Amino acid sequence: MVTANSTVKVGNVTFSNSAPLALIAGPCQMETRDHAFEMAGRLKEMTDKLGIGLVYKSSFDKANRTSLKAARGIGLEKALEVFSDLKKEYGFPVLTDIHTEEQCAAVAPVVDVLQIPAFLCRQTDLLIAAARTGRVVNVKKGQFLAPWDMKNVLAKITESGNPNVLATERGVSFGYNTLVSDMRALPIMAGLGAPVIFDATHSVQQPGGQGGSTGGQREFVETLARAAVAVGVAGFFIETHEDPDNAPSDGPNMVPIDKMPALLEKLMAFDRIAKAL
């Protein structure tokens, strides 16, 4: 039986619960080619300076927007062209989320990490299709799942022949329009064998909290991230934007990109202490 690898390599980036922190970061959705290059360039520069491995993320389609009228992204075909060019320009691996089995085969030749959205984390056919591409699969734990329930989710991928899987904690539903982060989930999920990622920005979401869109409390991103790094994680998932208040999606919980270097410095310092104990 194939089991999850405790160390997962994505290009030159290593994810392991006992290795130095790695980062998955980028804007919520891919807005334009120029915007993608602006964000990628700034993230590449800061992560090179800080010495932290970067996987650049962005979504070609936000398929689960609160409102039918909400912006969803530039689409699969255009996004794949941009991802390919970003990889050539900056040399980092890239991640995007997929929503159907058919998208897996289309995305895999370009994208290094296929991400399973939290709402879809139990969709067996989608998990199998993602696994069979041979790419690293990052599964967001559903807001409705207990951390130990991820055992069966991860098994659907590993038993399809792919041991390279990441498990991401992004909060659990707590009443209406509210998520909470139970830090016990991190060691529980680590006990399942896969590297654990903490999604510090979606964890402060207020789903549907603005009526026609999702709200958030970005002022608590650092609070939760510091707690998570003290417990111990393989990496962080952080969405960022140069002007979150005017971003087309998830603005209320994205970190302003000019605040990212200071945040990462703190998290890396705490990570060194936590993993030295």
Swiss-Prot record:
Keywords: Cytoplasm, Lipopolysaccharide biosynthesis, Transferase. Pathway: Carbohydrate biosynthesis; 3-deoxy-D-manno-octulosonate biosynthesis; 3-deoxy-D-manno-octulosonate from D-ribulose 5-phosphate: step 2/3; Bacterial outer membrane biogenesis; lipopolysaccharide biosynthesis. InterPro entries: Aldolase_TIM, DAHP1/KDSA, KDO8P_synthase. Pfam families: DAHP_synth_1. It catalyses: D-arabinose 5-phosphate + phosphoenolpyruvate + H2O = 3-deoxy-alpha-D-manno-2-octulosonate-8-phosphate + phosphate. It is found in: Cytoplasm. Belongs to the KdsA family. This is 2-dehydro-3-deoxyphosphooctonate aldolase. It comes from Brucella abortus (strain 2308). The lineage of its organism: Bacteria, Pseudomonadati, Pseudomonadota, Alphaproteobacteria, Hyphomicrobiales.
